UniProtKB/Swiss-Prot annotation:
Residues 1-14, 88-227 are mitochondrial intermembrane. The gene is MT-CO2. Its cofactor is Cu cation. This is Cytochrome c oxidase subunit 2. It catalyses: 4 Fe(II)-[cytochrome c] + O2 + 8 H(+)(in) = 4 Fe(III)-[cytochrome c] + 2 H2O + 4 H(+)(out). Mg(2+) binds at E198. It is a multi-pass membrane protein. Component of the cytochrome c oxidase (complex IV, CIV), a multisubunit enzyme composed of 14 subunits. The complex is composed of a catalytic core of 3 subunits MT-CO1, MT-CO2 and MT-CO3, encoded in the mitochondrial DNA, and 11 supernumerary subunits COX4I, COX5A, COX5B, COX6A, COX6B, COX6C, COX7A, COX7B, COX7C, COX8 and NDUFA4, which are encoded in the nuclear genome. Component of the cytochrome c oxidase, the last enzyme in the mitochondrial electron transport chain which drives oxidative phosphorylation. The respiratory chain contains 3 multisubunit complexes succinate dehydrogenase (complex II, CII), ubiquinol-cytochrome c oxidoreductase (cytochrome b-c1 complex, complex III, CIII) and cytochrome c oxidase (complex IV, CIV), that cooperate to transfer electrons derived from NADH and succinate to molecular oxygen, creating an electrochemical gradient over the inner membrane that drives transmembrane transport and the ATP synthase. GO terms for cellular component: mitochondrial inner membrane; respiratory chain complex IV. Residues 46-59 are mitochondrial matrix. It comes from Phyllostomus hastatus. GO terms for molecular function: copper ion binding; cytochrome-c oxidase activity. Keywords: Copper, Electron transport, Magnesium, Membrane, Metal-binding, Mitochondrion, Mitochondrion inner membrane, Respiratory chain, Translocase, Transmembrane, Transmembrane helix, Transport.
Length: 227
């Protein structure tokens, strides 16, 4: 989860988020190198007194500044396309969970179980227990087995919402009349927090998401107790 004064991303909990972090560092390094070169050229032009007035054209320079940006764009585009395909690829999910956005709460349905469904509301600050996180705790967490591929089907009953969990690298729009899907895979147990990331009305800020990643045995016990 996010911490006060945090400057970087949240710790990655899924292979997709790890790839996104690597891509961010890769792109940031390219931006840093370009910025350093531009600053060096600007400082050189401001500090040197030497001028070159006899050159009417410079084909070599023009060739370089045409080819070099193309190479840079390719080095950014290829890993980006790879991650996009990874995010869209869903192969043999172990479980499917349907998520519906409402004003202003989420409802979940485990489609592999006949009657396992519930609504998830934010716990008001006045009802928080000791150690609870303000505006992030919910009355019903989404319990998911770790190290298993889970397909999330996401839609909305009323207006546009967006189901987002940063530590898993997930952000999928919930659109009325349309069913979007994404996949998640957690590499370790724990609680992972997210929020609605699309302005959806006056209580938009009060639609938290809490995923509880547990072992398969714990999930089976929980699902049995909920049925």
């Amino acid at each position: 989860m996010a911490l006060p004064f945090q400057l970087g991303f949240q710790d990655a909990t899924s292979p997709i988020m790890e790839e996104l972090l690597h891509f961010h560092d890769h792109t940031l390094m390219i931006v840093f190198m370009i910025s350093s070169l531009v600053l060096y050229l600007i400082s050189s032009m401001l500090t040197t007194r030497l001028t070159h007035t006899s050159t009417m054209d410079a084909q070599e320079v023009e060739t370089i500044w045409t080819i070099l940006p193309a190479i840079i764009l390719i080095t950014i585009a290829l890993p980006s396309l790879r991650i996009l395909y990874m995010m869209d690829e869903i192969n043999n999910p172990s479980m499917t969970i349907k998520t519906m956005g409402h004003q202003w709460y989420w409802s979940y349905e485990y489609t592999d179980y006949s009657e396992l469904c519930f609504d998830s509301y934010m716990i008001p600050t006045s009802d928080l227990k000791s150690g609870g996180l303000r505006l992030l705790e919910v009355d019903n967490r989404v319990v998911i087995p770790m190290e298993m591929t889970v397909r999330m089907l996401i839609s909305s009953e009323d207006v546009l919402h967006s189901w987002a969990v940063p530590s898993l690298g997930l952000k999928t729009d919930a659109i009325p009349g349309r069913l979007n899907q994404t996949t998640l895979l957690s590499t370790r147990p724990g609680l992972y927090y997210g929020q609605c990331s699309e302005i959806c009305g006056s209580n938009h800020s009060f639609m938290p998401i809490v995923l509880e990643m547990v072992t398969l045995n714990c999930f089976e016990k929980w699902s049995t107790s909920m049925l």
